[in-house]
């Protein structure tokens, strides 16, 4: 089995605040074929901001 063809690949979520802070998570390609956008806490700026999937 190839890792690249995995249904749940590991993706990085990078902060849109420009701090460079990232979360690492897994996503289901069948349910979320587009890039993920999640609102999470960025400890560098101490507030909730959008995190976008980074490839």
From Swiss-Prot:
Gene Ontology cellular-component annotations: cytosolic large ribosomal subunit
PROSITE patterns associated with the record: RIBOSOMAL_L33
GO biological process: translation
Annotated GO MF terms: structural constituent of ribosome
Keyword Amino-acid biosynthesis appears in the UniProt entry: no
Keywords of this entry: Ribonucleoprotein, Ribosomal protein
InterPro entries noted in UniProt: Ribosomal_bL33, Ribosomal_bL33_CS, Ribosomal_bL33_sf, Ribosomal_zn-bd
Regions crossing the membrane: none
NCBIfam families in UniProt: PRK00595.1, rpmG_bact
Family: Belongs to the bacterial ribosomal protein bL33 family.
Protein name: Large ribosomal subunit protein bL33A
Organism the protein comes from: Kineococcus radiotolerans (strain ATCC BAA-149 / DSM 14245 / SRS30216)
Organismal lineage: Bacteria, Bacillati, Actinomycetota, Actinomycetes, Kineosporiales
Gene encoding the protein: rpmG1
């Amino acid at each position: 089995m190839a890792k690249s063809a995995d249904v749940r690949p590991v993706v990085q979520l990078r902060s849109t605040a420009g701090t460079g802070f990232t979360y690492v998570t897994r996503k289901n390609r069948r349910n979320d074929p587009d890039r993920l956008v999640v609102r999470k806490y960025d400890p560098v700026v101490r507030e909730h901001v959008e995190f976008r999937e980074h490839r």
